[in-house]
Amino acid sequence: MRARPLSAHLKALEAESMHIMREVAAEFDNPVMLYSIGKDSAVMLHLALKAFYPSRPPFPLQHVDSTFKFKEMITFRDAIAEELGLEIRVEINEDGRARGINPFDHGSQLHTQVMKTEALRSAMTRHKYDAAFGGARRDEEKSRAKERIFSFRDTNHGWDPKNQRPELWSNYNTKIKQGESIRVFPLSNWTELDIWQYILEEDIPIVPLYYAAHRPVVERDGQLIMVDDERLPMKDGEKPDLKLVRFRTLGCYPLTGAIESSAQTLEEIVLEMLTARTSERSGRLIDHDESGSMEKKKREGYF
């Protein structure tokens, strides 16, 4: 049960997000929610459950499994699906898995392209989704800051930042041709702090990796990489150290850096966020593989 009522600020954000979700449900034939298992997905799912209560959300959840997600993420995903009775469709690029594509031998750029972007495009095409909810926020990264809430994608699922529609006074253009689609970002106007305060006040379950705990990590290029399984190759003389760390953002474990932290409760995480001076995505290695990489990925069909 929530310990305190929502602030006026969070109530306004919640109302806007639920309005967007209901608009999509009314205007599109085959929407889907992209579920990455992280904190933003947790908030987005919670909002969907509230927006359509007492019914279930009128769309499935789609998870793209790169095969390198943290084990705790997959365990959490399956538990949430069972607890809430939701349909979560899981997409894996089987061709990429057969080729042994991985971030160690092939690098983060190719791994992300094959195991995430191509897998997502395949799922979008096969299921004929015409709208897909995503948990991106404008405060995360510069290319996301300029993206519309209703983001038009062409028949190849690509994003053209020069081909965007005006969004005035919460009016959204939902018209598309066959084969085109819209990526919808109901959390666009939320900040990382908003997300954590909402999780705290709504008592939303999240992956335990967000809480500080002693975990085996190695330091590489200034990032603390958690040794989540035996696939992480050790360099000469390298040995995992147990450190008190947590994650601000979650993705493929070899490409996601932890931060040293003692925040083990939601209240402590919120306090930590009040003094944070770095972006949460500073720990995502895929954002550093080339200049403008996020925009390039989105042009190719990335989340």
UniProtKB/Swiss-Prot annotation:
Gene3D superfamilies in UniProt: HUPs
Gene Ontology terms: biological process: hydrogen sulfide biosynthetic process; sulfate assimilation
Enzyme Commission designation: 2.7.7.4
Keyword set, alphabetical order: ATP-binding, Nucleotide-binding, Nucleotidyltransferase, Transferase
Pathway assignment: Sulfur metabolism; hydrogen sulfide biosynthesis; sulfite from sulfate: step 1/3
Highest taxon of the lineage: Bacteria
Region (Disordered): 282-303
Complex and partners: Heterodimer composed of CysD, the smaller subunit, and CysN.
Protein name, per record: Sulfate adenylyltransferase subunit 2
Organism: Maricaulis maris (strain MCS10) (Caulobacter maris)
